[in-house]
Amino acid sequence: MEILVNQRYFMSFASTSISPIDGRYSNQTESLKPIFSEFGLIKHRVKVEILWLIALSNDSDIRELPKFSNQNLKHLNHLILEFSEKDAKAIKQIERKTNHDVKAVEYWLRNQLKLKKMNKANEFIHFSLTSEDVNNLAYAVMLKEGLSSIVIPSIKKIRSLLK
């Protein structure tokens, strides 16, 4: 019985973390979570898919997808800017059925467009993209955002303290 008690004692947050980053340094890395967590990755995948869809709609050679109205663009931008934990959880629910993370984003986005009667655009979600395309771009945007909004300002602050 004492062994079980000791095992439970050692199963604390820090000892069940994947690395020291989310364990003993979790307080120092808290600001990175919205960008580099799984939530952040899902959010950035959504952003990549939407920006690609907007780019396709702006291409006059793709006549099957009309240019988005201001109202539709506003809705798409809202999906990016107001992406929430609830949205990420909905995508994770879809992923449980599809067993495919990027496909789950695609299905979630299709549903969001269907709700706004943007059915023509539905056919062009993920058009000519691979999952690797979406992931590579999402990770690149995450790195850029993390560097510009957290890492570089932190380095500048430390540098000014050392002067």
Where are these regions (language model features)?
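N-terminal amphipathic/basic-hydrophobic helices that include classical n-h-c signal peptides
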Residues: 1-10
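A helix-coil-helix interface module used to build multimeric assemblies
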Residues: 9-163
